[in-house]
Amino acid sequence: MASTLAEFEVQWEIQKTDLKGNLIAETPRRRRRGDATEHEVINLVRYDGVRLYPGVTIVCKVEGADELSAYMIHEVRLNTSNYVELWCLNYLSWYEINAAERYKQLDGEFYETNKEKGDKFFEETFASQSIKNELYLTAELSEIYLRDLQFVANIKNEKEYLDSVNEGKMDSNMFLCRSACLPSGTNLADLDIHFFEEKIRSSNPKVSLEYLRDITLPKLPKPLNKSKVHAREKVVATKLQSDNTPSKKSFQQTVSKTNAEVQRIASTIVNEKEAISDNESDLSEYHESKEEFANASSSDSDEEFEDYQSAEELAIVEPAKKKVRSIKPDIPISPVKSQTPLQPSAVHSSPRKFFKNNIVRAKKAYTPFSKRYKNPKDIPDLNDIFQRHNNDLDIAALEERFRTVSAKGKMETIFSKVKKQLNSRNSKEEIVKAADFDNYLPARENEFASIYLSLYSAIEAGTSTSIYIAGTPGVGKTLTVREVVKDLMTSADQKELPRFQYIEINGLKIVKASDSYEVFWQKISGEKLTSGAAMESLEFYFNKVPATKKRPIVVLLDELDALVSKSQDVMYNFFNWATYSNAKLIVVAVANTLDLPERHLGNKISSRIGFTRIMFTGYTHEELRTIINLRLKYLNESSFYVDPETGSSYMISPDSSTIETDEEEKRKDFSNYKRLKLRINPDAIEIASRKIASVSGDVRRALKVVKRAVEYAENDYLKRLRYERLVNSKKDTSGNGTGNEELQSVEIKHITKALNESSTSPEQQFISGLSFSGKLFLYALINLIKKKQTDVQLGDIVEEMRLLIDVNGNNKYILELKRILFQNDSVDTKEQLRAVSWDYILLQLLDAGVVVRQYLKNERLSTIKLNISMEDAEQCLHEDEMLKTF
């Protein structure tokens, strides 16, 4: 299969067709605004005639999996990072269906009679009755690579499959699909597979995905009809093959063509069709309920707004209002029309319909979750409805585990290594010993263990808690939390711990503090509400929804300092929700200020944060040196091919082959290129780590300095290379090939140059060039900020400057400066409090963006705020020789 762009262009061709399969000619002319839009379907055509497009089912062998897996192509994307991406809907096989839940849904009497026998009994029963070639479609999306493609499947509905069995036309590529379900293998629903295939091709990807999610959402159970329950007993009357255990067999099954097998499949299809149709609403009722609700939503009464419900809930709560049509379950009829317009005027045909849809959408955005359920007992199980579409984990790092049906073995986690010692007194020491932190999280093993124990205890017990983490920027706070959550999530995927959801909210990415409600609720439920409705929904969710109907949530409030407001409502609500008994909420707050709760949050919030507080100290120079060496492990002592003409470089692997190059560059002739070896002087790393550890201990700054030093070393080499090329331009350079390896070192001078650049920002350079009066102004401003912790008035700064000069009056240099600034030789007067060129000094700082001023008629009452980092300003002022005497 195609794994590179060159192979793809040889094996595959991209075509665009209409809904009927006719090719659409590419034209450079831009379509006019009034023209009718033509729906395009992207096709991938292989050289042997295989055609892939939305709606086609493919069978793939995913890397790392033992078995084949089936997927329905949902969307073909072009011009992305992988050039062509296939986003597909996942199928489930018979052994992935939750047998107990299936019988509970379709045959309640059989389930109640045998539920004491356990899940294994239902699995064995379903294994003996199921059709091994049947697939179940889910709304879970996965990205599939063309290199994993095995063959294109032939999907049949139940009538076509039954005819094929009767006629003896079965083959290994034929599969039956008549149902959809949740990714967990529960809540089976009728599905016309061919209707859905056409819907994928003719509608927007979001529309078809939402349609599939709607029909698989759990609905409130209807009262069972006893006359129909008796008919359902036929489902378990016939047994299939001699297999009694639901072992995971090969994906392709050889179907027997005997008359007994034909009768068995026919009876199974008919009986299961009756069972499913009795328990689920058919497709026509589903669409009719949506139309009926859309028409009813045009009313502007306040009562209707308060009693708003979704289409699924309306269909459950008020079944008598629907006009139920009697149709055959074999042919589901849907009133949804194709989105391809038949006439040019069809684009503007029904503005009223779109207006009604907008009203429904607007009402839903303002309707809290609490308004949809008057009684908390009516709330369905939200474990499968919520929290299955959003998770703030590194999906790329865990991609294979999510896509693989059965892995060869479990991954080792902290829990699997020390699960017996987690509740002992030495649990923290055991966690530190269990993992090799030096290879991925050096110098943070104690903090990792503390956070792990707090999160593990809350997730395992299903309780709520709050954790406050503080430390200066760049000391590994967020990274440590993410590593802990990744390990816990791996344990949850392997069923070692209860499943939970991880959500990140960054305060710097939110415009207003109240917007965090919208972000939080959208990541929990997948729906977007306004701030007020989201806050009310969150309050209802954590306080009223029973704990058995939801999963634990771990929310990371990163950059907590940015969420602090005057009212403190946002901070209070987040920590207050964690105090509810039904919440199952774990709040991990990360801030840069050590005493933020006591200084800015107040007693009512500080008491709810609790006593679990973990402080991250700055890295020492030994720890910084270890981290730098770890990050530069593959760069130090590495080799490159360097083009003498252009200066472009290609990294060389130990086997002398280029790394991260495409096929054309791999075939390039490097005989005329220079071979360069890069070496980083250990003394240079030592100086960088010691210098940064003495200032802040910020590892990000240390890595940035070393990276910049490598760039300086590269520039020095290129300058030397250009000089040699100019000098030797008239000489024969045929002998300077790859055989002569040159050496370029990153020396102390490169580190020093990078340190000076990183420590002197444009604002710092401006402060260093200020006059003494401007520096004295900033010095007085910073002193007042440290003393008052509030806004500083201009008059207070003048008094502080005067006080500083009076205190240091014995210095002859200060006396001379006082005479120059205030133009007085002996006695001070009130008229002499204004320094010479005062407006110029203040405007100079304002224009540079160093300070911000509030303009009032009375200048002395106007507020002055520092607009840059206080640490950067103090660093520049401390370097001034005159201010060192203060």
Curated annotation (Swiss-Prot):
Binding site residues for Mg(2+): D558, E559
Domain of life, source organism: Eukaryota
InterPro entries the UniProt entry points to: AAA+_ATPase, AAA_lid_10, ATPase_AAA_core, BAH_dom, BAH_sf, ORC1/CDC6, ORC1_wHTH, P-loop_NTPase
Site (Histone H4K20me2 binding): E101
GO MF term set: ATP binding; ATP hydrolysis activity; chromatin binding; DNA replication origin binding; metal ion binding
Gene Ontology CC terms: nuclear origin of replication recognition complex
Any one biological process term the GO annotation gives: mitotic DNA replication checkpoint signaling
Region: Disordered, residue numbers: 276-309
Stretches assigned to the BAH domain: 50-192
Composition bias type Acidic residues, residue spans: 300-309
Binding site residues for ATP: G471, T472, P473, G474, V475, G476, K477, T478, L479, E559, N592, R700
Chain ranges passing through the membrane: none
Location relative to the cell: Nucleus
Compositionally biased intervals (Basic and acidic residues): 284-293
Keywords, comma-separated and alphabetical: ATP-binding, DNA replication, DNA-binding, Magnesium, Metal-binding, Nucleotide-binding, Nucleus
Subunit structure comment from the entry: ORC is composed of six subunits.
Family: Belongs to the ORC1 family.
Function (record text): Component of the origin recognition complex (ORC) that binds origins of replication. It has a role in both chromosomal replication and mating type transcriptional silencing. Binds to the ARS consensus sequence (ACS) of origins of replication in an ATP-dependent manner.
Protein name as annotated: Origin recognition complex subunit 1
Species annotation: Kluyveromyces lactis (strain ATCC 8585 / CBS 2359 / DSM 70799 / NBRC 1267 / NRRL Y-1140 / WM37) (Yeast)
Lineage start: Eukaryota, Fungi, Dikarya, Ascomycota, Saccharomycotina
